[in-house]
Amino acid sequence: MDLIEAKQNFERSSRHPWENARLKTILHLFSRELEHANNEDGYILDLGCGDAWLINQLSQFYPNIQFVGIDIFFEGDDIKDLKELYQNSSLNLFKTLDNFHTAFEEIRFHAALMLDVVEHVEDDRAFIQELIESNTIDRDTKILVTVPAYQSLFSSHDHYMKHFRRYTRNTLGRLFMDLGITVERSSYFFFSLWLSRWFFVKFMDSETTKENTALAKWDKSRFITSLITGVLLIDAKIGLLSNRLGLGIPGLSVFAKGQLADR
């Protein structure tokens, strides 16, 4: 979860179905890379990790991986509080890449995740370029980026979350190409959420600032959470398959996976 939302309550036990479904979608999309890193006692970076919930969950499936979470919005005791909350020796949290370099010299990441983070950065190219030039990734590093889809859906929620933009498959693909990253696969997912957001933007949206979002205040029962998570997961899989078949079903999110091209 983004730190803007997470700081309202780090210790929530109930996670929003979108978070659960996105976790399982990442496990599906990145299973080969995660398995490879696990077999080699590798390192995986989550750049813009927020409350680090996702990589903490991933570590339960892949215990041999050292997960590194970096977020420039960590403040005060945030890192200490999260380490105490998760009690996970596979989780390494830092405010910057430089802080990571100080603790771990000459480490190359098997994979780098940027999950719903680059939309928060005014200069997305410079942000990813800094990672490329950091000597922590190379041509063998797999890169996975997820972002919110369709600028036409930009709403008060995006303003609240401090988003600069939303993306399409084409704009995300061009970002990769401009940075010398070869796109292996990209797709939209979460069609049902796209439909509901389209309706919201068209008929209900206002610029009223929100104190929190559905992610931060989710408090439904385990049954309801599991049910909606299951529906969203089916939705995501249908969207991924349809895009592979060239059907082009839209979604509220879009991802691209690739690696640095030979130079």
Positions of predicted regions on the chain:
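Conserved N-terminal segment of class I S-adenosyl-L-methionine
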Residues: 1-107, 111, 115, 125-128, ...
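Conserved catalytic loop of SAM-dependent methyltransferase domains
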Residues: 53-54, 185-233, 249-253
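A SAM-dependent methyltransferase catalytic signature shared across enzymes that methylate proteins
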Residues: 173-187, 235
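Short, glycine-/aromatic-enriched active-site segment of Class I SAM-dependent methyltransferases
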Residues: 8-11, 145-165, 169-174
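Short glycine-dipeptide loop
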Residues: 136-143
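A short, conserved alpha-helix within the catalytic core of class I
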Residues: 121-133
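A short His-aromatic
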Residues: 116, 120
